[in-house]
Amino acid sequence: MRSHYCGDVNKSHVGQEVTLVGWVNRSRDLGGVVFLDLRDREGLIQVVYDPDLPEVFNVASTLRAEFCVQVKGLVRARPDSQVNGQMKTGEIEVLGQALTIINAADPLPLSMDNYQNNSEEQRLKYRYLDLRRPEMAQRLIFRAKVTSSVRRFLDSNGFLDIETPILTKATPEGARDYLVPSRTYKGQFFALPQSPQLFKQLLMMSGFDRYYQIVKCFRDEDLRADRQPEFTQIDIETSFMSSEQVMAKTEEMMRGLFLEMLNVDLGEFPRMTYNEAMRRFGSDKPDLRNPLELVDIADLLKEVEFAVFSGPANDEEGRVAALRIPGGAALSRKQIDDYTKFVGIYGAKGLAWMKINDLSLGLEGIQSPVLKFLNESIVNEIVSRTAAQTGDIILFGADQATVVAESMGALRLKAGEDFNLLQGEWRPLWVVDFPMFEKINGNFHAVHHPFTAPRGVTAAELEANPANRVSDAYDMVLNGCELGGGSVRIHNQEMQSAVFRILGITDEEAKEKFGFLLEALRYGTPPHAGLAFGLDRIIMLMTGASSIRDVMAFPKTTTAACPLTNAPGFANPQQLAELGIAVVEKAVKTED
C-alpha cells in the first residue's frame, strides 16, 4: 500500500511518484488549495491538492484530523520561501494526484495538538490515539532500538537469551506478589515473578554460564512516577565472573548504548562505597551533577548547651550534618520555613540555619537563631569545613543518622534544583560495598535480597556477627537514578542457610520455600554473579520523559488500573467456582 514512509521522503526523491499511507495530522484550505499534513510513525509530510483534479480535490476538502488515507503523488521541491526548517521533510512536498480514504475518524475524544489539555485518564483510555503523537511514537521507536542494541551486545559477548517461567512460586522479595489461582490444585496459587532471580541462578547451576533476558516482572506495590505493577528488566547472570568483571562488562554495554543512541560518551564510571555516598550525599544513589555535599560536624557540638545538637552528637546512632547552599543567604524566612516543612516529610523535627551575610565581619556578619549556643571557634570551624562564603546559607540536620541522611539528602536535591546548581548532563557511577543487612524493628533484613553473598567472611563468621557485614553488591547509578543493581550470589548451601537463619527464616521454613534451591546448591554449584537493569527507567532518562508511563505502550495508572480495557475486572462466577474461590465482601461496621 506504500512506497515510502512519510518521514523518509527527501530531496533525492524530487520528480518521483510516491505512494504514502498514514493519518491526517492537519488539513487546511487556503484560497482553493488544500494543504494536508500526512503523518506516519516516521514523521510528517506536506501534500498539496489543487482544483486541477476536481474529484480528488473534493475528497481532500472533506478530510478531518486522524482520517486514515492513502496518497499518491509527485514529489517536488518547495520554493525557498516555503522551506520549513522545523520539519524533517520541510524541503519538499507532494503534489497529490490520487487520494483514498481508508477509514474515516469520528470527532476525537482528546486533543492531539494540545495534549497538555488531556488528563492522564483520557490519554490512557484512548492510548491508541495518544501513541499516534510523534513524541510518543518516537519514544517507542527509540525503545525498540535500545533493546535491539542491548541484544546485539549481549549476543556478541556469548550471552544466551533463555526464557524463564512466568507462573512460579511466591518467594519473599520485598513486595507483594500477584497471585494466580490453580484450577487443578484447589486452594493453591502461582505467583507472577518479581524477578527471574532464582531461575537465572538455577541456569548457572545448569551450566549456562552467560544468560540474559529482556523480561516482564510484576510487583503489587504502591506506585510512583517511576513504578508500574508490570515492568521490564534487562536481566543478566554469569558464572565464573567476579563482581569487577560483571561491572566492567555491563559498564561497557551501557557506555556503548549511550554512544550509539545519543552520541554521548559517559566515560569511565567512578566507584563510591555505600558509606561514602550516604555520608556525602545522604543517598545510596547520589546525583553527582549536584555539587552540594553534607558535612559532618557532630564532633564540634558534643559540649554545646543546645540539646538539639548535642543530643545526636553524643548518640552513637545520631548525626549532625551541615549543608552549604551558595547564595542561600538571600532566602526569606518563609522560604526557610518551607524547607523546614519539606524535611519534616522525611522525619526531621526541624531545620537550623546560619546565614553568612558578611564573612569579613566575623560573628557580626553571621545571622542564626542558634548562634548564641556556639562559640566563635566552633562557628569558624563550621564555616571552614563547609567552605562557606559571604552570601551563603548553612542548613543543619540533627537527629538519628538515618533521618539526617534521608531528610538532608532530599533537601540537597531540592536546593540543587531551586538554585539551578546542576552541572553537566550525565554523571554515572557505581555504588559498591552495601551493608549485608539492615535492622528494622530489631530484626535483620537483607539490603538487596537473601541470595546476595557477603564479602570476605565464612558462614560461621557471618552468623556469629551479622551486623556491619558488607555484601558483594553493586548498583549502577545515573543522575540520581538507579539504572540497575546486582551482586555476587551465594553458591554454597551452608552460607545460604546461615543467611536464612539471620533473616529469621527457620530451617523448616527455608526447606518449604527454598528447598529446591538448597538442594541444587549441593551439586557442584559454580560461583555466579549478575544484575538487572530497569529498561523502562533507562528509556525514561534517555528520552527525557517525566514518567515511565510515557515510555511504555500500555501502562497502568497510579492505582494499577487500565482505563483502556477497564482492567482489573470481575471474574465470571463459573470461573470462580471452578477455581474454588469465593469473593468475600468487606464487612461494613454499623452503629446500633
From Swiss-Prot:
Primary localisation category: cytoplasm
Q: Does the keyword Membrane apply?
A: no
Q: Which GO terms describe its molecular function?
A: aspartate-tRNA ligase activity; ATP binding; nucleic acid binding
EC class: ligase
Please give the Pfam families that the UniProt record associates with this protein: GAD (PF02938), tRNA-synt_2 (PF00152), tRNA_anti-codon (PF01336)
| GO cellular component terms, A-Z | cytoplasm
Q: Which UniProt keywords apply?
A: Aminoacyl-tRNA synthetase, ATP-binding, Cytoplasm, Ligase, Nucleotide-binding, Protein biosynthesis
Question: According to the UniProt entry, what is the EC number of this protein?
Answer: 6.1.1.12
Which parts of this chain are annotated as the region Aspartate?
Answer: 197-200
Task: State its location(s).
Answer: Cytoplasm
Query: Quick one: which residues bind ATP?
Result: R219, D220, E221, Q228, E482, G534, L535, D536, R537
Q: What assembly does the database describe for this protein?
A: Homodimer.
Q: What function is annotated for this protein?
A: Catalyzes the attachment of L-aspartate to tRNA(Asp) in a two-step reaction: L-aspartate is first activated by ATP to form Asp-AMP and then transferred to the acceptor end of tRNA(Asp).
Supply the name of the protein: Aspartate--tRNA ligase
- Gene that this sequence comes from: aspS
